Amino acid sequence: MVRLLRYGTIFGPLKDRWRYLYKRDLYKRRLEAGPEPERFRSALINWNYDAELYACTHRFGEKLNIESLRNAMTDASFLKQIVKQRTEAGLAATDQTTLAFTHNQELAKQGKQIAEDFLQKALHYWYPKFPQEGIEAITKFLLSESTIADISSGLGFKTLIRCDIPSPRPTMLTNALFAFIGSINENTGRSRAEVFVADFILTHLVGKDINEIWQVKNPMGLLTKVLEENGRQAPESRLIWATGVSSVLSTYVVGVYSNKEFLGKSAGATVSIAEEMAARDALRRLFETDEKRAQIPFDKLYKKGLLLDK
């Protein structure tokens, strides 16, 4: 009865007991062999690189030259690998000048500069009171290798990049995305490249607090500096109220004022923590980056601010 339940009910009819043993043996062999080595996508028989490039241009709605896109997806390591193979084969062409394509370093520089200029312009437009140091910190976050590599991988560039390893490194993914922006600039103009940056890079700020991206180490010092630049008196901290002072759950609420004018307030477990958080709240109010401020309106960005004003 036990055998009948084991082989007859769970794994099919009793006559198919060999099937269970056969599959179990295959499974053990698969575990002993280990994972398959990583292979290039081009090693598979159904790979058509030209078709993939053509599909890429239509996926983003861009009219790009296929050769320009091919260069944008070619990493410098791939070029070195080709030159090395040709040299080992004894061919006369041992330098990249004789090859029909080039790497994406120059396009990547152009694309990164376009993205940086546009992001700073867009952030200045929507956050006019935000300091330049904060704008640069947000731009640096958006153009960081981890952010751009994540965007590039999500856009499907991972299988399009030609490099010397099966899985492109984050640096390769970053260069490919910047080179793609540079290729758009060369083929259809800077305005289309900026639209791409707005659609796929600037939107990375959705759901994020820019006040947390810019790490201010001394908020009270920055608040004092901002008030002095605007001709206002230095900030003054005042304890509004406290509760549970003699317990482990003590709470203090501190307000920040300038010439009896309320700037901000916050709570904290200690007076120093509450004072620091109150200074940060005052900075948010002065820079107009508090929670009441809406996210970047991309419809206004397209119509009024930047992209159509060319």
Q: Residue locations for each model-derived region?
A:
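Double-stranded RNA-binding/processing signature
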Residues: 1-310
